[in-house]
Amino acid sequence: MAYQIGSGKAGRGYIAHIGDYLIQSPAGWYNGQGWDVAPGFVASRFLDFDRVIDNDCLYCHANAAQFDESGRRFTGSALTAISCERCHGPSAEHVKHPSAKNIVNPARLNASARDSICEQCHLEGAARILNPGRNLQDYRPGDDLARTFVIYLRERNGESVKAVSQAEQLAKSRCVQKSGGKLWCGSCHNPHSQRTDRHREVREVCVSCHAKLSPAAHPKGQWECVSCHMPGVSPQDILHAAITDHRILRYRGEEEIEQENGDRLFTSREPPARFRKRDLGLAELKVGAQDGIPAMAEAGMRLLESLPDIEKQNDPAVLAALATAKLQTGMASEALALIREAAEKQPRNASYAFYLALALGKNNEIAAAERQFRRAIDLDPSRKEFFIELCTLYIRQGRAGDLAETIDRYLNWNPNSIGFRFQRVRLLPPEPEK
């Protein structure tokens, strides 16, 4: 393994460096539990080394990891740990001339800019949408996060906890809501030191507002707050892990009273006004498709279609999202026109080449579809789904030789793929009877 992710306090993940790609190990190590399936993997018959760790994955686990424009090919020399600049901004001038005036101090920012620093990594939400022409690395501490990307939330009563939902939980806390912006992550978390007495330090924050406690609810000797008001809960997306419940409930088992919003997305940080319909539409299409909510996906499509033509034509992400949605709803000819336009604007985008191939196939342009599948593979040979679709095309046409060649090409890139090896063996001629 080339890299280890995590300090080991909760666990560790592992990354291999294969060619131009970083690949996540399907096995992870958990403190107190040992080895098990890594986050995001499901225990199954085949656990392959084929999950590419891209820019989105590493943004919060490594410092300024360098990738190509696709965000998948690793172009840096090595990964390094998160540095001071992630929270304090560019520091070259501060190193030369140390001064409080040339470095960002989160505690001195307004609440929105201050909380944006924490939320860039500790708020996952349902969808993260980049504004046009922006990438994750464009965010700078001191800015409002929504100038770079917007995190949309989908709130439901009893929703499973995720490992990076602390900021979302905290925002729902009545303590935060009534503090006027004074209570924030930094009130309890000091990233510059190790706690010597965690419960006592947190209690000091609590009693700064709750000086008088009910004797009936707080018997003598029960002086610490966390065990009852912020108990540990198990996140759904990571095995053998526990995070603190940041809703700060009055008592164990209490659920905050909230309106059911399962089919609506919202954000606490709106993007610039000119991007609001665009960003929400992209988020609704994405979440509606991945969570199986047709009404949400349809609402997202309507929002994007309502954008001025000039905006749609100049925004490949919008064109591709509309094309994908129309492809899934049987509007193949409209999808083809849209994805062709997106692919022309970004000819190096492997995903657009792939969706163009799918659209061509749905329009019975099989030869053109084959060429685009091959082109998508040339652009990004790490995408297993590209090979699977091309193999499916060859199976339907009875082209066993081309099928074997395509499987061999994937195995040349990833020789450890159990699934592809299994399929390749099935294509071997039967052994002669003895």
Residue ranges and their predicted role:
Residues E305, D309, R340-E344, R374-D378, ...:
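Conserved structural position within tetratricopeptide repeats
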Residues V287, D291-P294, T329, N363, ...:
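Structural motif corresponding to the intra-repeat A-B loop/turn of tetratricopeptide repeats
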Residues K312-Q313, P347-R348, P381, P415-N416:
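Short coil turns that delineate tetratricopeptide repeat
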Residues M1-S7, G11-I18, L22-P26, V37-V42, ...:
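Primarily the internal scaffold of c-type cytochrome electron-transfer domains
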